[in-house]
Amino acid sequence: MFLIGFRDDIYTKPYKFPEKMELTHASTEYLEPSPVDDIYYLGKKGFEWITDPKKNLRRSRVNQDIIGCETANQQDNWIGDFRVEHPQPWHYNDDRIYIGQFDFNDGNGLVDAVGRKMTPRECMNLMGFDNTFNIVVNDSIAYRHAGNSIVVPVLKALIQSLTEYL
């Protein structure tokens, strides 16, 4: 939510927010090319947590057909966005990465799958930062920065409308 206010005695015409933008990108466009570092892949507990339909009902939802999203809170602090994908050959050789069963709704039923959290770069991409934006902090802080940031295209549209207004 953005609030913009002006003094009535200085700016008499009403401010008009920018029109809604049509979303034109698929979520996969924000992902890094495979492979991503193994540290982003989940073990058994994490995989079961993100694929359990009963637990999914309690999560916050933002376009749930695309990606599962969890909000940070003081009790749990499990934070981030997750992806379930088909395993690559090297995943079978890494004991830390859990390979579970998941139905991708592609007609194949339950098949091998791995879960992973999005990388900080992917989270920044999702917020509209391009790849020239340098992430100079550790992953934990980068996730928080991405979560607390303003979506870049929205900010650009607001600034453009404000410069036209003023």
Language model: regions and residue ranges:
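Class I S-adenosyl-L-methionine
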Residues: 1-92
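FAD-binding beta-loop-beta segment adjacent to the flavin cofactor pocket
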Residues: 95-106, 110-137, 142
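A helicase ATPase "motif cassette" and its flanking acidic/Ser/Thr-rich regulatory loops
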Residues: 151
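Short, hydrophobic alpha-helical segments
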Residues: 159-166
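Generic alpha-helical structural context detector
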Residues: 68-71, 124-128, 160
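Short, flexible coil/turn micro-motifs enriched in small/turn-prone residues
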Residues: 63, 142-144
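Acidic-aromatic/histidine active-site loop/patch
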Residues: 155
